[in-house]
Each structure stands twice: as C-alpha cells, then as structure tokens.
Amino acid sequence: YTTLFRSGGVETQFPGEDRILVPSPREVATYDLKPQMSAAEVADKFVDAVDKYDVVIMNFANGDMVGHTGFVEAGIAACEAVDSALEKCVKKVLELGGKLLITADHGNAEHMRNEDGSPNTAHTTNLVDLIYVADDKDQVTLSDGILADVAPTLLSLMGLKQPAEMSGHSLVTPGK
C-alpha cells in the first residue's frame, strides 16, 4: 500500500530501492481477531533498516484494517500495538540522531461508531497529524498543511531540493 502510493502507482522497484514487506497475519478471517497484526515485526524490521538506509518509509496498517471491522475494543488494541511499536522506532531514531515523521493519509480507527451507534467501517476525512520526532524538535516550527506537503517536508529534512512538479511545501522550518 505505502510502496504503491509512494511510487506513484508504479509496481516496479526503482534502482537503489529496497522493499521489505512484512505480511499481515493470514490465520484470522478479520483483523479484529488479531488487532496487533504484524506491528511488532514491522518495528523490528524498521530498527534493522534504519541502521542501513538514509530513508525508511513504513506503514502500520492496524488502525486502518481493524478500523474497517467496526469493533471499537479491537480498534483500541490495534492503536495500542502501534503505539508500542512506534516507541521502539522512536527510541532507535533518537539514538542515531535521526529524524522521524509520523502521519497517515486518512483516518479510520478514530471514528468507529456513528451517532446512532452503528459501526462506521469507512475511511474518514478527518484531519491527520504530522508528528515530527528529532533532537532539534524544540528549534523548529511545524506548520499545518496537507498531504501534498509531506514529501516536500521529507526532502527538506534530508537537505534535498524539491522538484518543480511538487506543489506542496515543507512543514518544518528552522526557528521557533
């Protein structure tokens, strides 16, 4: 999912790109039955990969996939599993003096019940956060933006020039 959209819908692997795919559990019919899914394994792969690569892009599918089931308690467990996995990722990035962006392209698990009590199993259009984790987080300003701003933000943090084709702008600027 992340790979396909990050690559502009292209399935073919680009030169210099490695893909590490962690399969979701197949032993359950629906993910409310295993809301932790593969979050711990994704975090372990991230911790290994961040030592080797300048950029690692990953996806925790828990909130989305479990959110589609409409089972609130499972949704909470899914988010807790991601929280635990992210703790490991954040610790590793900070140990290395790196920077981490955490975001999503849509909501789901944050709104699993409609006003009438029926399950909401669809993606939401709620705003999503962009969380910046780094040792210098107190020396930068993080602006509000849109999804088109995420890639320019990543390029900016890497010190790379933004292509003219990108219409967004960096959401992280030096200074408070």
What annotation goes with each model-predicted range?
Residues 2-176:
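Feature captures the catalytic ectodomains and active-site-proximal regions of enzymes
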